[in-house]
Amino acid sequence: MKINVLAFGVAKEIFGSSLVSLELTNDATIYNLKYLLEQQYPRLKQLASYMVAVNNEYALPGDTIHERDEIAIIPPVSGG
Amino acid sequence: MIFGIKDYWSKDKWTKESLIFDLFVLDQLINDMTNTQILLSAETLNIQSCIDWVMSPESGGIDVFIGTVRNATKGKAVLKLDFEAYEPMAVTEMEKIVQQAFDKWPVQRVLIHHRTGVLQVGEVPVIIAVSAAHRDAAFDACRYIIDTLKQTVPIWKKEAFEDGDIWVAAHP
């Protein structure tokens, strides 16, 4: 399945775009997504940490991704 | 929320007692809808209007946290900050924090206003205002809200220095 990944903050600069498209297997997890992204964008591994959000909620590494989910890369937050 | 409006109107037995109870519940529902205000804005925040909004005759005190753009980080001059938000999720996460504050402390009204966009030194990126009958709850909730916001709400700031820009907290 093809999914779109939103990027914010430093992740947007690492991807060179606020939106990237990826091809994932149908039962892909957050862990699989992070692995794939880190292969394509090694600078992600240099971040202090980063989370993935699915449909506006923080996701866990074992969570499955579904087609049409809204996926976002959340680098360390620094609001306030 | 105890029950939805649909359930409310489909009640088939109307007694004086149940009506009084229902009006009480409805009042609570309306109150629930107006005791929280969350705003993400690209416009200048208005401190006085935030204080006015949380003030009520039942309040014994108001706690306000105002974040301001500092002119230096670790001795290096900061020229400006640029705030970016994942807006729908930022609002959802702020709503969660406010709900946690209501669960933990007897607070009356809670407000969070947060800026997006470019802010100059001295400008205000965030205002948190909390009213309560007694000051302990207001102090504790206000502190909890700003501390948790900084950990969980998807908002990012980029510091502009004379020799380049850095996303805060991005790298170890």
What is each residue range found by the language model?
Chain A
Residues 1-78:
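Ubiquitin-like/PB1-type beta-grasp interaction modules and other compact soluble beta-rich domains
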